[in-house]
Amino acid sequence: MAGIPTSRAASLVVSNDPVTRDQFYNGNIKVERAAIVLRLAKTWFRIGSLEMLTVNSETELLKSTVEFIIRNYFETIDHKDTDCLLALFQEIVHATARLIAQWQSVGFTHGVCNTDNFSLLSITIDYGPFGFLESYDPNFVPNTSDDEGRYSYANQPDIGAFNLNKLRIALLPLLTKKQAKQASTILKGYAGIYKSEYMKLFMKKLGFKCLDTYSEDDEQFVAILLKIMEDTKADFTMTFRELSELTLDQIELSIKQEK
């Protein structure tokens, strides 16, 4: 999906068996044909996979599961290292921040961002009621059952931090007191990582050089553009597409005419 890590659809099987669905949760039930979509991913381990073990006090199983995950999916981390869990948590925090910044950069809204739908490998999974922004609306919610807008487009970055905190809590039975404090410090770095990646992607969309640093002017520029798009109900994707068609001469001419 636009170069963003995601599970992939492998097959679709449709039968003549009838199923009833209330697609928009408004009481209008319809009969449809049953179908099964088979999706592929490197693994289906999620934050919720570890949460469940911690809640049920299955510490030994939690320990062996985390060790399995590190050995099989995080090859750069030595599972025998005493700080391997911190290394794992840090990598997941960084990768999740980058993933959500990528979502925001293309207007993707997942729909159901609970911990059971957040991959430990930071790939996009379980996005049933997803949607993409059309006219720019930060409060866009594709899931009609999300009445409070908890998983709106604008809320996704904060939900990412919320879910990562749940992962931190799930790992606590395996951490020393010192490591628990270090994990909290790692989590505090999430916002900065997300913001940096977000700015890099949006500056790239606007045709600017993608530097590792950005200024307050850059942030203000992006914020003003998005506010204009919100006020005018401009199409999110087409706005950037149309901007890419402008030449430097056209932009300079427009600036001169403004003056």
Predicted regions and their residues:
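Conserved ATP-binding subdomain of kinase catalytic cores across diverse folds
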Residues: M1-T82, L121-I125, Y151, A161-L164
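Conserved kinase catalytic-core helix
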Residues: G3, I92-V106
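Beta-strand segments within the central parallel beta-sheet cores of soluble alpha/beta enzyme folds
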Residues: A9-V13, N114-N117, A183-K188
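Catalytic activation segment of kinase domains across protein kinase-like and atypical kinase folds
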Residues: G27, V31, S105-H110, N114-P173
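Alpha-helical scaffold segments in soluble metabolic enzymes
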Residues: S64, F68, R98, Q102, ...
